[in-house]
A protein has these predicted regions:
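Surface-exposed loop/turn elements that mediate protein-protein interactions on large endomembrane-trafficking
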Residues: 1-18, 36-59, 82-121, 151-178, ...
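Repeated scaffold domains used in trafficking and secretory/extracellular systems
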Residues: 13-28, 55-71, 99-131, 176-190, ...
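Short beta-strand elements that form the blades of beta-propeller/WD-repeat-like
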Residues: 22-43, 67, 71-84, 135-154, ...
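Fungal eukaryote-biased detector of long internal structured cores
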Residues: 75, 115, 120-138, 145-146, ...
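Conserved long hydrophobic alpha-helices within structured protein cores
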Residues: 84-98, 125-140, 254-263, 280-291
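A contiguous, surface-oriented mixed alpha/beta subdomain in the mid-to-C-terminal portion of proteins
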Residues: 215, 233-243, 257, 261
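C-terminal appended segment following the main domain
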Residues: 277-282, 287-329, 333-334
Length: 359
């Protein structure tokens, strides 16, 4: 059993009843608490207390968001476009693409065209993320792009992974993903030229992709067909994944995606009362190059407090359970600098944790 210390508690900026759960981003030694409401996206610097508010171009149910490492710009990955805005809400650039709603064939010009349409209210979605240095935006969209011409519009739409210039939205690289997504998310890498992408296809599968941008072209490799990316180690050399059934944690080499070691939840983690199935959460974190923090909060639900565990990467062995000063809820998420965070059950605060001195 490992004791941990509470590094900080951060109050969320928006009412949880009308906003998404908060996320704590970490880039280059800086943390940024981000929370999306219907009318705005808020980015809070926990160290300085400075808050930046980005007016939202559409309600929060229509797509996903990303914030630049310096907190100065935000990207909204919507149903019809990837839009970059500054803190005034002014559009810096926009990349319009095929509509994510069902079989809709339209490359829309504005959100108002479908704002009141029920089918568009339940559209699938892509995602976007800034590179580590903030100079690139990686985006998963549905094709065709607005500038692809009539020939592309007549073809069966393909989903695309784009590398965009964060300054002006220029498409620098693109690759077809061959997927039919219901949603996706990105996993950043310390190297701005690399990025991970997990794509959920509902019952069709869950491919995980790894992209590399060499300044001229985007190359994409499939990590696994039933795989979810969880985190990248601080050195950038190791990748943590799980399978869609959440049976095991897999340590992989970023260079080629090769599986190095794994750890099954069953047999490693103490069982549940009544013999229920134990499985890993869809979120976990590298505390450092040699230590993973992972949880079984999903399978623990209904049986007691969420349980979190330390895993030694050298052999992918369970080092032990974590003892917190008070019960925690939900999974663990990476907070950088050897720390991780949890969100309180009422979603009103974020707790940042680190191993106690000597642990």
């Amino acid at each position: 059993v490992t004791a941990v210390r509470l590094v900080s508690t951060i109050d969320v900026p928006l009412d949880p009843g009308s906003a998404d759960a908060p996320a704590l981003l970490h880039r280059a030694g800086r943390r940024l608490l981000v929370q999306r409401g219907d009318a705005e996206l808020v980015a809070l610097d926990p160290d300085s207390g400075d808050t930046v508010r980005f007016p939202a171009p559409w309600p929060r149910g229509f797509g996903t968001v990303a914030v630049s490492p310096d907190g100065g710009t935000a990207v909204f990955a919507g149903v019809h476009a990837v839009r970059c805005v500054d803190t005034s809400g002014a559009v810096l650039w926009e990349a319009r693409h095929g509509c994510w709603a069902g079989e809709c064939p339209v490359v829309h010009g504005a959100f108002a065209e479908y704002a009141d349409d029920e089918e568009h209210g339940y559209a699938d979605s892509g995602s976007a993320a800034f590179s580590a240095d903030g100079k690139l935006v990686w985006a998963h969209v549905r094709g065709p792009l607005a500038g692809d011409g009539d020939a592309a519009a007549d073809e069966e739409p393909d989903e695309l992974w784009l590398v965009l210039d964060a300054a002006d939205g220029r498409v620098m690289g693109r690759a077809g993903t061959g997927t039919v997504a219901s949603g996706s998310f990105h996993t950043p890498h310390p190297d701005p030229a690399q990025m991970g992408l997990s794509i959920g296809e509902g019952e069709e599968g869950s491919p995980a992709l790894w992209g590399r941008w060499d300044g001229r072209s985007l190359s994409v490799r499939t990590i696994g067909e039933e795989t979810v990316l969880l985190d990248v180690s601080p050195s950038g050399r190791r990748l943590l994944t799980t399978d869609v059934q959440q049976d095991a944690l897999y340590l992989r080499a970023v260079e080629d995606g090769a599986r190095l070691r794994d750890l099954d939840a069953e047999g490693a983690v103490a069982g549940l009362p009544g013999g229920g199935r134990v499985y890993w959460d869809f979120e976990a974190a590298f505390a450092d190059e040699h230590t993973i923090v992972a949880g079984t909060s999903g399978s623990d639900r209904g049986h007691g407090p969420a349980r979190h565990w330390l895993v030694d990467t050298a052999g992918m062995t369970l080092r032990g359970g974590i003892t917190y000063p008070h019960p925690v809820a939900g999974p663990v998420r990476a907070a950088g600098d050897g720390a991780w965070y949890t969100v309180s059950e009422d979603r009103r605060s974020v707790h940042v944790w680190a191993p106690a001195d000597g642990s």
